[in-house]
């Protein structure tokens, strides 16, 4: 048994892989002196997915990394060989995780069933190889496209926690002490009624199993009708696997543990018949405060009157705690197995189209003048510069033709350019000549 940090809200960065670049290769084969273009397309970038895993109860494992980046697509190759697609990243999150966009707050997904999958970052599409650019006027195109960048965003993951174990019992029977002993929860503990005013949630790890324990506060006689605080908090345990009912077996406060049990049991039945039918164990706390003879008498009476399995313990000394935790883990594991089989959504990972943007051949050009320097800019100027490989002869030529077609010369003259001034295009400098 180990204690697990409880984390229910995190921010992560996700990015799809970049598409691979297309190839600008040519056939080089014996007896084929003028082999044509044979450059293959780049592979698509990998995607990032979130998947609801019923075996997780906290976002701790996800929070250990801040960035999740899928693999880039492989570049295209000769012989019309496509590059390999980048590997996806699949992030397991607990069932009940709500996914929001960090910037807008928009809810992207509510992963409320085991096995649900959502794509949160698409990979970029691979660039085209030079086989796509062959034409009657360009028989040997030395041009290819660069792959498109993958989608990137920041996400907020929030966990709507569903308790696996609901702790019930009168105030001061030791619920808060018990949950702090077995988990990471650290409730304020004092000896007066209604000490706990919000549900304390703790995460316990037993071997590979994580489960959530909720300490339901203020549950007293009349709670189902709104007395105390119980009516508000009973909802937190409606979907739990097991009710752990803690009683003060010592009776030090003058109450009868058997009567206490039936009082609380009655409230559960009034609130929800479904809740009342859940598996239940009774934890008889404060065994260190009475003699062994008196303890045996009281335990026997409790067993006989309730017909339930009784687990004697002293939360203060720790006696009997481990046995209780392993019993709870056994019940939760069986319940999870049943619910997972009945509720699981066997979703195949659906891959939307990779990220890609068709660029128009007609667009606006802007000129920024800084002394004798004239910087050519504009949204599509930048995007075409990224799309085409300007180190390739025909790629550079196509880029300059696009600029000329969209009035580069006219724009420069309107900006007051003179012979000998410097023109900057895509981080390259040229001397302007009339």
Swiss-Prot record:
<dbReference type="InterPro" id="IPR031167">
    <property type="entry name" value="G_OBG"/>
</dbReference>
<dbReference type="Pfam" id="PF09269">
    <property type="entry name" value="DUF1967"/>
</dbReference>
<feature type="binding site">
    <location>
        <begin position="314"/>
        <end position="316"/>
    </location>
    <ligand>
        <name>GTP</name>
    </ligand>
</feature>
<dbReference type="InterPro" id="IPR036346">
    <property type="entry name" value="GTP-bd_prot_GTP1/OBG_C_sf"/>
</dbReference>
<keyword id="KW-0460">Magnesium</keyword>
<keyword id="KW-0342">GTP-binding</keyword>
<comment type="function">
    <text>An essential GTPase which binds GTP, GDP and possibly (p)ppGpp with moderate affinity, with high nucleotide exchange rates and a fairly low GTP hydrolysis rate. Plays a role in control of the cell cycle, stress response, ribosome biogenesis and in those bacteria that undergo differentiation, in morphogenesis control.</text>
</comment>
<comment type="similarity">
    <text>Belongs to the TRAFAC class OBG-HflX-like GTPase superfamily. OBG GTPase family.</text>
</comment>
<dbReference type="InterPro" id="IPR027417">
    <property type="entry name" value="P-loop_NTPase"/>
</dbReference>
<dbReference type="InterPro" id="IPR006073">
    <property type="entry name" value="GTP-bd"/>
</dbReference>
<dbReference type="Pfam" id="PF01018">
    <property type="entry name" value="GTP1_OBG"/>
</dbReference>
<dbReference type="GO" id="GO:0003924">
    <property type="term" value="F:GTPase activity"/>
</dbReference>
<dbReference type="GO" id="GO:0042254">
    <property type="term" value="P:ribosome biogenesis"/>
</dbReference>
<dbReference type="GO" id="GO:0005525">
    <property type="term" value="F:GTP binding"/>
</dbReference>
<dbReference type="InterPro" id="IPR045086">
    <property type="entry name" value="OBG_GTPase"/>
</dbReference>
<dbReference type="GO" id="GO:0005737">
    <property type="term" value="C:cytoplasm"/>
</dbReference>
<dbReference type="InterPro" id="IPR036726">
    <property type="entry name" value="GTP1_OBG_dom_sf"/>
</dbReference>
<keyword id="KW-0547">Nucleotide-binding</keyword>
<feature type="domain" description="OBG-type G">
    <location>
        <begin position="163"/>
        <end position="333"/>
    </location>
</feature>
<comment type="subunit">
    <text>Monomer.</text>
</comment>
<feature type="domain" description="Obg">
    <location>
        <begin position="4"/>
        <end position="162"/>
    </location>
</feature>
<feature type="binding site">
    <location>
        <begin position="215"/>
        <end position="218"/>
    </location>
    <ligand>
        <name>GTP</name>
    </ligand>
</feature>
<dbReference type="InterPro" id="IPR014100">
    <property type="entry name" value="GTP-bd_Obg/CgtA"/>
</dbReference>
<feature type="binding site">
    <location>
        <begin position="169"/>
        <end position="176"/>
    </location>
    <ligand>
        <name>GTP</name>
    </ligand>
</feature>
<feature type="binding site">
    <location>
        <begin position="194"/>
        <end position="198"/>
    </location>
    <ligand>
        <name>GTP</name>
    </ligand>
</feature>
<feature type="binding site">
    <location>
        <position position="196"/>
    </location>
    <ligand>
        <name>Mg(2+)</name>
    </ligand>
</feature>
<keyword id="KW-0378">Hydrolase</keyword>
<feature type="binding site">
    <location>
        <begin position="285"/>
        <end position="288"/>
    </location>
    <ligand>
        <name>GTP</name>
    </ligand>
</feature>
<dbReference type="InterPro" id="IPR006074">
    <property type="entry name" value="GTP1-OBG_CS"/>
</dbReference>
<dbReference type="InterPro" id="IPR006169">
    <property type="entry name" value="GTP1_OBG_dom"/>
</dbReference>
<dbReference type="InterPro" id="IPR015349">
    <property type="entry name" value="OCT_dom"/>
</dbReference>
<dbReference type="Pfam" id="PF01926">
    <property type="entry name" value="MMR_HSR1"/>
</dbReference>
<feature type="binding site">
    <location>
        <position position="176"/>
    </location>
    <ligand>
        <name>Mg(2+)</name>
    </ligand>
</feature>
<feature type="domain" description="OCT">
    <location>
        <begin position="355"/>
        <end position="434"/>
    </location>
</feature>
<keyword id="KW-0963">Cytoplasm</keyword>
<dbReference type="GO" id="GO:0000287">
    <property type="term" value="F:magnesium ion binding"/>
</dbReference>
<protein>
    <recommendedName>
        <fullName>GTPase Obg</fullName>
        <ecNumber>3.6.5.-</ecNumber>
    </recommendedName>
</protein>
<keyword id="KW-0479">Metal-binding</keyword>
């Amino acid at each position: 048994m180990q204690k697990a940090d409880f984390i229910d809200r995190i921010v992560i960065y996700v990015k799809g892989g970049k598409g691979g670049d297309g190839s600008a290769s040519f056939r080089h084969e014996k007896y084929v002196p003028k082999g044509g273009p044979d450059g293959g397309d780049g592979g698509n970038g990998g995607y990032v997915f979130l998947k609801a895993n019923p075996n997780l109860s906290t976002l701790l494992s996800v929070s250990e990394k801040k960035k999740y980046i899928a693999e880039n697509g492989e570049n295209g190759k000769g012989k019309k060989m496509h590059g390999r697609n980048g590997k996806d990243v699949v992030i397991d999150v607990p069932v009940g995780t709500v996914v929001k966009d960090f910037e807008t707050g928009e809810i992207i997904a509510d992963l409320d069933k085991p096995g649900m999958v959502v794509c949160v970052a698409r990979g970029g599409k691979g660039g085209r190889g030079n086989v796509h650019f062959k034409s009657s006027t360009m028989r040997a195109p030395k041009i290819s496209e660069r792959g498109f960048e993958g989608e990137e965003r920041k996400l907020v993951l929030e966990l709507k926690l569903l308790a696996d174990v609901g702790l019930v019992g009168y105030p001061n029977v030791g619920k808060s002490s018990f949950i702090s002993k077995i988990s990471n929860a650290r409730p304020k503990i004092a000896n007066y009624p209604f000490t706990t005013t919000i549900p304390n949630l703790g995460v316990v790890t037993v071997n590979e199993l994580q489960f959530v324990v909720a300490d339901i506060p203020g549950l007293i006689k009349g709670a189902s009708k709104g007395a105390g605080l119980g009516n508000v908090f009973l909802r937190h345990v409606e979907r739990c696997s097991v009710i752990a009912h803690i009683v003060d077996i010592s009776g030090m406060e003058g109450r009868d543990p058997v009567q206490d049990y039936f009082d609380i049991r009655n409230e559960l039945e009034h609130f929800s018949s479904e809740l009342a039918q859940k598996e239940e164990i009774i934890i008889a706390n404060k065994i260190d405060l009475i003699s062994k003879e008196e303890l045996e008498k009281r335990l026997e009476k409790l067993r006989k009157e309730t017909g339930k399995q009784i687990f004697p313990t002293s939360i203060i000394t720790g006696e009997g705690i481990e046995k209780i935790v392993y019993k709870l883990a056994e019940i939760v594991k069986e319940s999870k197995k049943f619910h997972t089989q009945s509720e699981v959504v066997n979703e195949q990972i659906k891959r939307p189209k990779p990220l890609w943007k068709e660029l128009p051949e007609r667009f606006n050009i802007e000129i920024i003048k800084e002394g004798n320097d004239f910087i050519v800019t504009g949204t599509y100027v930048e995007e075409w510069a990224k799309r085409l490989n300007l180190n390739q002869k025909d790629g550079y030529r196509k880029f300059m033709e696009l600029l000329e077609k969209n009035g580069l010369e006219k724009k420069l003259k309107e900006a007051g350019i003179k012979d000998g001034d410097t023109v900057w295009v895509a981080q390259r400098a040229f001397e302007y000549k009339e």
